[in-house]
A protein has these predicted regions:
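Cytosolic regulatory modules rich in charged/polar residues
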Residues: 1-159
Length: 159
């Protein structure tokens, strides 16, 4: 019951909470510079992470050109490992928001744009990014990754 009331209270706070309170700063973002990057090297970088969507740029990390949809790119790449794999087919246009947008407005934007990541810009300067996961964590608390979850068996080991 305590968790339920906390979630309800957090959802009511969404109209007051702003993106600037929950976004990931640019310095902590994982991004990829596509300039002069071979497809093989891109695959190597992607496989070293667990991200399904990665902001990408050419030369200037403040000018994100889009969000690489990893699953789409890898499917195309594995289907045709040649230069014919068009990277642009796997990059979606970024959804851009102001740091002063409320969480309510952000969620509405995520739904309308059919996106899960928004880039946070102020005066054409990239401040960071905010994800649907950030919003959910604000609502229900920290979300554990699958690898962080330890199954509970209910049985204790006997010594």
């Amino acid at each position: 019951e305590e968790n339920e009331s906390e979630i309800i209270q957090n959802s009511l706070d969404f109209s007051d909470t702003k993106v600037k309170e929950i976004f990931t700063p640019r310095e902590k973002m994982f991004t990829i510079n596509l300039k002069n990057l071979s497809l093989d090297k891109l695959v190597e970088i992607i496989c070293s992470t667990s991200y399904s969507r990665i902001p990408v740029y050419y030369d200037n990390p403040n000018k994100i050109v889009g969000i690489l949809l990893v699953k789409n790119f890898l499917a195309d790449y594995l289907d045709d490992k040649t230069v014919k794999t068009d990277l642009n087919d796997s990059i979606e246009k970024p959804f851009i928001v102001s740091p002063n947008v409320t969480i309510d407005e952000l969620v509405d934007g995520f739904q309308k744009q059919r996106k899960q990541i928004a880039l946070v810009y102020r005066n054409n300067v990239l401040l960071g990014m905010v994800t649907m996961e950030d919003v959910l964590e604000e609502l229900v608390g920290t979300i554990s990754e699958k690898s962080e979850i330890v199954p509970q068996t209910g049985k204790e080991k006997k010594k």
